[in-house]
Amino acid sequence: MTLPRSSRSVAVDGAQPYTITIAPGLLADGARLARHVRGRHALLLSDSQVAPHYAAGVRAALLSARPDLQIGELVIAAGEASKTLDTFGSAITALAELGATRDACVFALGGGVVGDLAGFAAACWMRGVDCVQLPTSLLAMVDSSVGGKTAVDIPQGKNLVGAFHPPRAVLADTDTLRTLPARELRAGLAEVIKYGAIRDPLFFQWLHAERHALLDSDPAALAQAIARSCEHKAEIVARDPLEKGERALLNLGHTFGHAIETEQGYGAPGNDNLNHGEAVAVGMVLAARLSATLGMSNAQDTEALRALLHDFELPTDIPPGLPPEALLARMRLDKKNIAGRLRLVLWRGIGKAEVVPDVEEAAVLKILAG
């Protein structure tokens, strides 16, 4: 199958280079899927929302190109609540029961939770097998499927147990966005906005101009947003694959956002808790407000960010019932911290993020208290 003219590809350079392909119809392209399976075993990991739409088609596409494949399947409950060590254990068991050898491949068919679990299982099985990311949510296409960060949550915090394991390929089939709930689309757009906020003022302006098209799931607008976001992440990941420096900038809003998610208990789909993208949206506003309080930026840029997020129908305030002290306690467990001191991604205005070490907790607590 040749790619349509609307397709785009982004190369991720580094010690383990790979390509992000963005196009409609990729999940039906058996030859393209199967070329990434070096051996005879493949595990297809998906969730209860995505699998009914796409799992059978992906399996059929793989077998049409590689009838010799032995394909195992694991379907987990949808939502962040499944990103646990127990579910990770289920993935490892599935690989064992499949008889997967070191040339096996794990296909991650779903959003960020599926991608994290599949990637972590692939990283650990026999000390590392291939993983192909098949993101079906906008958030996964522009963020979690790219870069090789894999992890699960524990009660004490989000993404505290994991590994760096770059995928063999990322195949982002934009047709899957047709079945994406509106709330999940908006969650992904929060991560898209982040790229404009941290390093691309022109992209920030473009997002404002195209906000109605993006919210209406216009294919051309979404393809452009995905490609530009992936280009930004690919550039950063290539220079800093293990997050020793610049890559931390991709976490604007995440320290605050992860604290909110953890304190709310990683709610299941359909409840009132914030999802990841929504929590990041709130976190970005909090980071911008803290930056202004510290004299790093101005109130106008903070308001521009808040207004853009609001225009995309995203939350910008901490949900009620979350004590500031409890959120601060969660933030103390963030992986970016050093020697027990808060280390946050803040900004000097639109397009100019930076990592700030040793942020005073009193200033953070004041922002959390509103």
UniProtKB/Swiss-Prot annotation:
Q: What is its EC number?
A: 4.2.3.4
What are the names of the required cofactors?
Co(2+); Zn(2+); NAD(+)
Pathway assigned to this chain's UniProt record: Metabolic intermediate biosynthesis; chorismate biosynthesis; chorismate from D-erythrose 4-phosphate and phosphoenolpyruvate: step 2/7
Cofactor note (record): Binds 1 divalent metal cation per subunit. Can use either Co(2+) or Zn(2+).
Q: What class of enzyme is it?
A: lyase
Keyword GTP-binding among record annotations: no
The UniProt keyword set, sorted, is:
Amino-acid biosynthesis, Aromatic amino acid biosynthesis, Cobalt, Cytoplasm, Lyase, Metal-binding, NAD, Nucleotide-binding, Zinc
Say yes or no: keyword Ligase present. no
- What CDD domains does UniProt report for this protein, alphabetically? DHQS
- One matching Pfam family: DHQ_synthase
Q: State the source organism's domain of life.
A: Bacteria
Recorded GO molecular functions are: 3-dehydroquinate synthase activity; metal ion binding; nucleotide binding
Catalyzed reaction equations = 7-phospho-2-dehydro-3-deoxy-D-arabino-heptonate = 3-dehydroquinate + phosphate
GO CC list: cytoplasm
Q: Which residues bind Zn(2+)?
A: 191, 254, 276
**Cell compartment(s), UniProt:** Cytoplasm
Under the heading InterPro entries, the entry gives: Dehydroquinate_synthase, DHQ_synth_AroB, DHQ_synth_fam, DHQS/DOIS_N, DHQS_C
What's any GO biological process attached to this entry? chorismate biosynthetic process
Residues that bind NAD(+):
112-116, 136-137, 149, 158, 176-179
UniProt xrefs under NCBIfam families: aroB (TIGR01357)
State the similarity comment: Belongs to the sugar phosphate cyclases superfamily. Dehydroquinate synthase family.
For this entry, the protein name equals: 3-dehydroquinate synthase
The organism of origin for this protein: Xanthomonas oryzae pv. oryzae (strain MAFF 311018)
